[in-house]
């Protein structure tokens, strides 16, 4: 697919956000969110674009590294997949360094959480981990506000 008038391949960056402190607390959550991110990457690739998938960015340090990686790969656009709650400090360094437009993906793993199964779990830690797998919308207002304040389109 030709992405611009120069005939070069259109390249999109993809990264997902999470919070590194969650992984040791909630068994399987990191792997689950990584799997969802892979699904998004495959869907993007089906459109014919080149996808630079940096996976889960879950700390400010990884955010800085991701921003540099997107610049190095000369991405034309970034898809930010909000997989669960995360801090704006895991987002802002990426988009500031990349200096390209960003599309927020607020996608849920399914149409709704299965509350019947959820309420039968009986273990509050497992329940919280399950809830976090459906917590995409939690961070979107914070991210949108940070983008607005920093004038990021």
Which positions does each model-derived feature cover?
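An N-terminal assembly and electron-transfer interface module characteristic of large anaerobic redox
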Residues: 1-153
């Amino acid at each position: 697919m030709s992405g611009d008038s120069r005939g070069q391949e259109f390249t999109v960056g993809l990264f997902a956000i999470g919070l590194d402190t969650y992984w040791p607390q909630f068994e399987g959550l990191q792997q689950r969110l990584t799997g969802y991110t892979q699904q998004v990457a495959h869907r993007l690739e089906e459109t014919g674009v080149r996808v630079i998938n940096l996976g889960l960015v879950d700390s400010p340090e990884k955010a800085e590294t991701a921003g540099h990686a997107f610049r190095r790969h000369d991405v034309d656009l970034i898809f930010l997949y909000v997989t669960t709650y995360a801090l704006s400090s895991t987002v802002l360094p990426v988009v500031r360094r990349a200096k390209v437009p960003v599309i927020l993906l607020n996608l849920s793993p399914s149409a709704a959480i299965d509350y019947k199964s959820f309420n039968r779990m009986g273990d509050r830690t497992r329940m919280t981990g399950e809830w976090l797998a459906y917590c995409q919308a939690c961070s979107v207002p914070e991210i949108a506000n940070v983008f607005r304040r920093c004038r990021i389109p």
